């Protein structure tokens, strides 16, 4: 199974990923947790489950790696380990996700893969990594946050505060969650 949790900033994507990861630890699954090398925020989510996962990683109950891309060496190393389930947070910051998934499927590994991350940038343009994996996903859960401008429960846009220099800029303080009305309306 390949599952994607997507949505805007502050919609609970990573928290949903961590919730399922914790369930898999109870089931004693062999787990790999993958994070992008460029995400240096020092935490996974803003929830209290964050400490449970960090503790499990520190106690070696969950293996955690940081990568820039799924190159052939990384993919082969992952396949050799025969993980039951792989969790990938902020997948859009990691290159070659499709190649990774196709290799898992071709090798018939029976490994479940859970993704979490944005599918679009703060200009509402799809990330290439999202476009590449969407057709391969068995399940997609799109989450909404709360609009910081009007309070709508349909906050599904990540609005960048200030001048944006790159398509991806790591840092929660640079963004806020807004609804479509505020994203495309006079508020902007």
For each feature predicted by the language model, list its residue ranges:
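Conserved P-loop
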Residues: 1-74, 121-132, 142-145, 157, ...
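Short, cysteine/histidine-rich loop/knuckle motifs that typically chelate Zn2+
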Residues: 149-152, 181
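Walker B catalytic acidic pair
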Residues: 89-91
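Residue-level preference for the first positions of well-ordered beta-strands
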Residues: 2-4, 30-32, 84-87, 112-114
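Sensor-1/coupling segment of RecA-like P-loop NTPase cores
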Residues: 106-129
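Residues immediately C-terminal
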Residues: 93-96
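Short basic/glycine-enriched coil/helix segment immediately N-terminal to the Walker B
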Residues: 75-84
């Amino acid at each position: 199974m390949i599952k994607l949790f997507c949505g805007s900033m502050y919609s609970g994507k990573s928290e949903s990923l961590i919730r399922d990861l914790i369930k898999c630890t109870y089931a004693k699954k062999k787990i790999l947790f993958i994070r992008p090398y460029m995400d240096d925020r020092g935490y996974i989510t803003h929830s209290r489950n964050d400490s449970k996962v960090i503790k499990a990683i520190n106690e070696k109950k969950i293996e955690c790696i940081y990568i820039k891309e799924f190159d052939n060496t990384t993919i082969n190393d992952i396949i050799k380990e025969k993980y039951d389930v792989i969790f990938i947070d902020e997948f859009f910051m990691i290159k070659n996700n499709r190649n990774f998934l196709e290799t898992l499927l071709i090798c018939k590994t029976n490994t479940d893969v859970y993704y979490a991350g944005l599918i679009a940038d703060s200009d509402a343009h799809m990330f290439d990594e999202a476009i590449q994996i969407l057709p391969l996903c068995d399940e997609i859960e799109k989450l909404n946050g709360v609009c910081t401008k009007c309070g709508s429960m349909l906050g599904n846009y990540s609005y960048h505060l200030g001048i944006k220099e790159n398509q991806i800029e790591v840092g929660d303080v640079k963004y806020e969650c807004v609804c479509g009305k505020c994203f495309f309306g006079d508020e902007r």
